[in-house]
Amino acid sequence: MESIWSKTCDIRKREPLRADIEADAVIIGGGMAGILIAYQLKQVGLHAVVLEAERIGGGQTKNTTAKITSQHGLFCKTFIEKKGKETALRYVQANQEAVEEYKRVIREEKIECEFQETDSYVYSRDEDKLKQEADAACEL
């Protein structure tokens, strides 16, 4: 199934890199995260190059529901078990900081994108897993 973004947005095709170039940083991937990093590096005066296999915004970003979120389903419990509470907390904080950074850039650059803050929900058919996830999230 083709996403609405594929149907309604004409992403300009870029020519492939054909020669060696110099840069302060190379970013692999031209999705939302890669472009945000490139923007941040430019803001501090660094020359960054974004390398994207297909088209900018054409991979995972294209297939989203146009959301920027720090909530990624049932992940806290498993993350804590695999990586520990401290690493899980840093991950959750970094995700929320990214959401705040997108909001800041949209506001400061006056980007017209109909950005809205809304509630986030996680659905599960397994009530026990949902409770365990809520407990794990509260630990963080």
Which residues are covered by each model-predicted region?
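Short, glycine/charged-enriched secondary-structure capping and boundary segments
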Residues: L41, N63-A66, A136
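N-terminal Rossmann-like FAD-binding beta1-loop-alpha1 element of flavoenzymes
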Residues: D20-V50
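Extreme N-terminal leader/targeting segments of oxidoreductases
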Residues: M1-A25, Q43
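Glycine-rich active-site loop/strand segments that organize a redox cofactor
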Residues: G59, N63-A94
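Rossmann-like flavin
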Residues: K82-L140
